[in-house]
Amino acid sequence: THKQFPNYKRYEIEYEGRPLVMETGKLAELCNSAVLVSYGETTVLVTCTASARPKDGVDYFPLSVDFNEKLYAVGRIPGSFNRREGRPSLNAVLASRLIDRPMRPLFPSDLRNDVIIACEVLSVDRDCSPEITAMIGASAAVSISDVPFNGPIAGIVLGWDGEKYLFNPTQEQRKTNRMITTIAATHKKIVMIESEADQVPDDVM
């Protein structure tokens, strides 16, 4: 592997009881950077591509985050007449925003180059969130690229079942949770909190 891919690197840690593996230097080498992230059985390929020159006539940062979750990732065939994938699902759109929201403020405010972060979900383990996997991969991909970025960030899902907190809860645990909160942070501060919950005490929140 090292002879065929001299830039290949692999890192593995345990993240809330499950293996988190990041690999780079093997896929999508024409992008500014690419990271293959696996969390449990969930695998996401995240690529970062930036234009060489600033975009003319814009007064904002043209960042685009695309989260693509195809049916093959869960072992299914599209049920439409022509067996083709449809438009991005609501979940995919929300996942794209979930990744965009904590990362966008960490780029320089005067950056005007087009930057596209593409998260391609290759396989899904329903107990290991593809959204969190993609968020970690997106942060890693931008961090190792030549795009200026004041990261990295990490994300975690925090659940509460009425008695105790659960970190990155499984799909079964989520069904009974009274609160599901997604948190993204740098090593210094929290940059995003998104929550859906029943009525819960203030001290729990």
Where on the chain are the PLM-derived regions?
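Short beta-strand elements
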Residues: I13, E23-K26, V35-Y39, V44-A52, ...
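Stable alpha-helical structural segments in soluble proteins, enriched in small hydrophobic residues
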Residues: P102, T133-S145
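Catalytic cores of large soluble enzymes that bind and process phosphate-bearing ligands
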Residues: K3, Y11-E12, P19, G57, ...
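Mobile "lid/hinge" segments at catalytic clefts and subdomain interfaces of large enzymes
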Residues: D146-M205
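Short, Gly/Pro- and small/polar-rich lid/capping loops
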Residues: T1-E29, A34-V35
